[in-house]
């Protein structure tokens, strides 16, 4: 299954990684592709602090219930051996973030042609 993450909003990043975590928990491979603002969030390593703009009540509830942060979900995904995190080279260039690519922890960098080849025939696709 494949998740395409464009938005860097905390809730969407969390949802995308949760979908991937559910897939690997059932023994399925999962690939998450990062574009634009989602990619920027990963490059800035902003995966810990719940960030629900204008909704401190949700952030408080999120923490009090012990819900996993995106970082915790990412660690679970990596530990599964069934997960790949991919970054879009076009988005990387548009963000001017090429110097951050090597230390990003992103497994593979691809352009759209390669992304389309890798995901051809995948029926379970999620766009966030």
What is each of the regions a protein language model found here?
Residues 72-128:
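A charged, amphipathic interaction segment
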Residues 14-26:
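Histidine-anchored nucleotide/phosphate-binding helix
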Residues 50-84:
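A glycine-rich helix N-cap at a beta->alpha junction
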Residues 1-14, 30, 42, 62:
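Short, glycine-rich nucleotide/cofactor-binding loops
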Residues 30-36, 86-88:
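Short internal beta-strands
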Residues 39-51:
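N-terminal beta-loop-helix "entrance" segment that forms/cooperates
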Residues 48-52, 103-106:
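Short, hinge-like loop/turn segments at secondary-structure boundaries
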Residues 36-40, 92:
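Short beta-alpha junction loops
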